[in-house]
């Protein structure tokens, strides 16, 4: 599983012109699911996200986590995180999990995040979405449950 975690002052996602998810201070998270991801991968990424210490403390050091600040999370599914561009000019998405299995894991991931008692919003799996991200910093962290980064 891969995640692009962006610290935001706010973020929202629209489908067909309607806002379906919106947050204030927290993380905008783009999630990609691979063919070999398991529940353990979901837990690993969830724990990393909620415990990343990238929010400023009283000394202006990045020392606080999403849990510490009671931040919010907007999760967007994005299979293109598994685009392999090493050969040719068109990305190969063979490593991305497809269809129903990816949707099932995505929903399990959302359920896991919700156990953290933080506000969790999400996009619509498989939909064409418009995402507004007001980056704070910017701070962007790449996570990979297979530790490839």
From Swiss-Prot:
It catalyses: glycyl-tRNA(Ala) + H2O = tRNA(Ala) + glycine + H(+); a D-aminoacyl-tRNA + H2O = a tRNA + a D-alpha-amino acid + H(+). One of its GO terms (cellular component) is cytoplasm. Its main location: cytoplasm. Its EC number is 3.1.1.96. It is found in: Cytoplasm. InterPro entries: Daa-tRNA_deacyls_DTD (IPR003732), DTD-like_sf (IPR023509). A motif (Gly-cisPro motif, important for rejection of L-amino acids) lies at residues 137-138. GO terms for molecular function: D-tyrosyl-tRNA(Tyr) deacylase activity; Gly-tRNA(Ala) deacylase activity; Ser(Gly)-tRNA(Ala) hydrolase activity; tRNA binding. GO terms for biological process: D-amino acid catabolic process. Keywords: Cytoplasm, Hydrolase, RNA-binding, tRNA-binding. A Gly-cisPro motif from one monomer fits into the active site of the other monomer to allow specific chiral rejection of L-amino acids. PANTHER family: D-AMINOACYL-TRNA DEACYLASE 1, D-TYROSYL-TRNA TYR DEACYLASE. An aminoacyl-tRNA editing enzyme that deacylates mischarged D-aminoacyl-tRNAs. Also deacylates mischarged glycyl-tRNA(Ala), protecting cells against glycine mischarging by AlaRS. Acts via tRNA-based rather than protein-based catalysis; rejects L-amino acids rather than detecting D-amino acids in the active site. By recycling D-aminoacyl-tRNA to D-amino acids and free tRNA molecules, this enzyme counteracts the toxicity associated with the formation of D-aminoacyl-tRNA entities in vivo and helps enforce protein L-homochirality. Belongs to the DTD family. This is D-aminoacyl-tRNA deacylase. The lineage of its organism: Bacteria, Bacillati, Bacillota, Clostridia, Eubacteriales.
């Amino acid at each position: 599983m891969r995640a692009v975690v962006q610290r935001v002052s706010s973020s929202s996602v629209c489908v067909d012109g309607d806002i379906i998810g919106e947050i204030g201070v927290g993380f905008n998270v783009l999630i990609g699911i691979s063919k070999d991801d398991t529940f353990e991968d979901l837990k690993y990424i969830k724990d990393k996200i909620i415990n990343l210490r990238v929010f400023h403390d009283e000394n202006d050091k990045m020392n606080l986590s999403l849990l510490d600040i009671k931040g919010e999370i907007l999760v967007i599914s994005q299979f293109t995180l598994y685009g392999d561009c090493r050969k040719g000019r068109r990305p190969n998405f063979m490593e991305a999990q497809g269809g129903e299995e990816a949707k099932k894991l995505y929903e399990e991931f959302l359920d896991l995040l919700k156990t953290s008692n933080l506000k969790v919003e999400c996009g619509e799996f498989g939909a064409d979405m418009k995402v507004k991200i007001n980056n704070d910093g910017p701070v962007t962290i790449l996570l990979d449950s297979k530790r490839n980064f």
